[in-house]
């Protein structure tokens, strides 16, 4: 038997080891928090500050507002055009989004599935697809305008920009509104019916007022996205120019960062103002839908029984869904069709062309998307946990900063990175790291929201119980929090992968010529009029994203079935 001295010595040794391990764990915990907060300040706040500082720099190096006057004189018309397009696009896309969301929320069976599939495909498709399909369907030699209706119309104008932007913004807005509609209290709708209210009265007096804050959110988001969109005006705007398009041309053509920064301030300031309005509206929307947090399979309302308003929404959503089907049908077919004297035939020549010039680009896009998906998801999980559960000092400020990129125009975020990381001690321009960082932090707001929603389902008492049993902070994070966030990990991974494969605005100024991505090959092909190759690139990107989403769905379904079988 061991002597009492030996036992005491082993106990003291074990105690000292535990103390040392606890100190190391606490140090690692604080280091993780420091890295998270420092990264938000460095990669979100600092680029925005660099834009503001550069726009105020005068010729003598001092503070000057002269560049703003120059921008107003030279680009005042473009600014007015941006506001004009933004207002019309916001209104039209919100009306279409509301109609499509109500149709999806009230549909049953295969109709609901069909609507959701169409919107899913539209959501995961790369940018510029709407412009590409618009030219092929409604251009001077378009399939519908010229070949079917024998018309030769000029599609390159402001109304084409408004129409294409509106259609592009509808899927995301409609999915957001569908989620809000599914959380409405079914009891209030039943009570209204029991009191004799008609379907139209329920829609007008109960449903629409409850989702008014969410509808205003869609209006604001559509306006900001329209302001930030440079691709659509460049491709189909013709002589009609917007401020975002002029910023792109100013940076790419003249590399005038002072003027570009001042131009970006006219987009940045309203975006930040709308950001705070957006947060207030989201809080109000959460309060209005708090009565029923469990999502319903369908909204207990029939649009055909809602009178003229219901039929109007059905008609609008039908037009939208038909246009989406035509749009993507055109894009998928164009990559495999060749026109010879007006006669179309099947061909693989564009596939061979894509394989020769774009295979490495496509692989690089997938590689970048996978890196951002994994790193961005882990970062979002950690950030959501420390903000939601640790309640650190300045939590509201850092949460606000982390959400800010959601409302920032992509050109602002991209130019901010050029200004912030173009010199020592942190020179990142020309490297893959600056592109990956920009993608990660541009997508951080949505990823953090997903993780925060999953954390809300984890009772804090489980964490406290683990701490009471002697587990350290990192042990709680590893053994309690991360397992509970597995569904959120998969959702964030899919979102980050999809966004990384289809993003363009914020990284267009950061891409090195030797490290091209597929989405910019798509933009170049559309801009140069090579529509068949552009259609094939868009189709391949869409198929890759849908494959990853389908794989994630199967993994989720398998995990759910395994949990059910265990219970």
Regions found by a protein language model. Give the residues of each.
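Transmembrane alpha-helical segments of polytopic membrane transport and secretion proteins
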Residues: 1-35, 280-318, 554-567
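Membrane-water interface segments at the C-terminal ends of transmembrane alpha-helices
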Residues: 28-59, 71-182, 210-231, 262-280, ...
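A short amphipathic helical element positioned immediately N-terminal to and/or at the very start
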Residues: 63-72, 346-355
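Glycine/proline-centered hinge or cleavage motifs at structural transition points of membrane proteins
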Residues: 195-197, 209, 469-471, 483
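Juxtamembrane inter-helical linkers in multi-pass membrane proteins
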Residues: 198, 286-303, 340-354
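Glycine-rich helix-loop "coupling/hinge" segments at transmembrane-helix boundaries
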Residues: 230-254, 339-343, 504-531, 565-567
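Helix-loop-helix hairpin linking two adjacent transmembrane segments in secondary transporters
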Residues: 245-270
